[in-house]
Amino acid sequence: MKEKVLILDFGAQYTQLIARRVRELEIFSEIIPYHALPAEIPSDVKALILSGSPFSVRDANALRPDLSAWVGKIPILGICYGAQYIADTFGGSVARSDKREYGKARLKVLKPEHPFFSGIAQGSQVWMSHGDTILELPEGFELLAETDSIPVAAYASLPGHFDKMICCV
């Protein structure tokens, strides 16, 4: 059985790009819709990526899969909506941003020693596309990076908070 990374698709325009980048690392990936997340982790799945979305976690009908069987068992990467969903789910605060960010931004890494930023240069150019922003991180998470416009550009679970790390961008 081939090990893989599961990509949970919330309807982002770039989910296929995420899968391609994972494949370029010679890692098999599979994209599934957010509502098809298995209740138990399949033995061949070694990590989970939560994609972005055109929707907001603040919406009454926000897309909210149950991650309880997954958190702490395998590494999780939240991207855009995925990052906002993780923050919201664990008690953080997400709000509509008064500084909508779309396009290139410079990343200010606040914790360069964190393994998530291994090989990433200070001031790296990144792509941002979102209308919501994370105002407050949940307990058990730490801020890793910001941009000039957005105070929470990357964050992660604190070491030991979960058995397996959650990182979000």
Question: Which residues fall in each region the model found?
Answer:
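Flexible gly/pro-rich beta->alpha loop and the following alpha-helix that scaffold active-site loops
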Residues: 2-7, 12-79, 84, 90
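Pocket-forming structural segment of enzyme catalytic cores
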Residues: 63-79, 84-169
